[in-house]
Amino acid sequence: NGKGKRLLLIGHLDTVFEADDPFVGFRREGDEAVGPGVGDDKGGDVVMLAALRAMQAAGALRDADIEVVLTGDEEDVGSPVSVARADLIAAGKRADIALDFENLSHSHGRDMGSIARRSSNTWVLTVHGESGHSSGIFSDELGDGAIFELARIVAAFRNELPEPNLTFNVGLVGGGQTAEFDAGKTHLAASGKDNIVPPIALARGDFRTLDAEQTRRVAAKMQAIVARHLPRTDATLEIDENYPPMPPTAGNRALLARLNEVNRDLGLAPMDELDPLGRGAGDISFVAADTDGLVGMGISGGGSHAAGESADLGSIPRQAKRAAILMHRLANTPR
């Protein structure tokens, strides 16, 4: 009716597993379901649907302002991101509050509330050097070669970058006489000989930050490290900011307080804030600048992104009740 808070519900339909992954099929053992995507995010989508059905049965949807966005490329966002997430970003600008239905988080056996998600940024390092017989390596003519320069750079990342709420990883590396990524940069073909100084080396990885300022600061430090070339080498670092951060905010904490009021009324334990290091990146971050938000409204489970991923089907009623009551109360809170 335009009077209450406008809600945006976010889930996704894809899974992280590639088509040729050996982890396939679905099985159920009591309340445990095992299969690719059962928790991330099929189970969350089911919780969302169950909550909406409960609201419909109670007549609570009649005056609620709720929009649902289910993406199909959350695990590997399309390019360019500005196009792939244009509809989601637009929905965020129409909303007051966003609820993310990915997996419920736990710590020491307790359900946790998530009010933040870190960014996801990928980088590609390309290093060139002189080539020649290995007997001349480290000479003025040949220098250190591309692989030693790459090793220096990634070791400097490890030693110089660490700070709170930051993680960074080298996921793929190779070098030699030749080195080339495939189109998706998930495979790398390299060739070389032990008596030839390598002229090329490649690496790719990611880094994750809690806010935009940390992203800018870390990217600048990485570029400065790359610029300190070893003799007779050159290197470039390309950085793509794939998922923005969702920093913890006062508005997000207030939402968690509202959820804990629901927990109290349901006789459930209060949910403390989850450490942001406990979650990966996600779609809600694209609307974090425009809305208050909560993460982890979905199913309880384990093993996300790994063979044996599981979901606790018995958690669906609990999570659906939490979501339905919270959404009803928010939808009746004046804007």
Model-predicted segments: where are they?
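Short, flexible, mixed-charge acidic loops at enzyme active sites
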Residues: 18-28, 116-119, 183-188
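Acidic/histidine-rich catalytic neighborhood of metal-dependent amide-processing enzymes
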Residues: 37, 41-116, 178-185, 331
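Short glycine-aspartate micro-motif
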Residues: 6-8, 33, 96-100, 124, ...
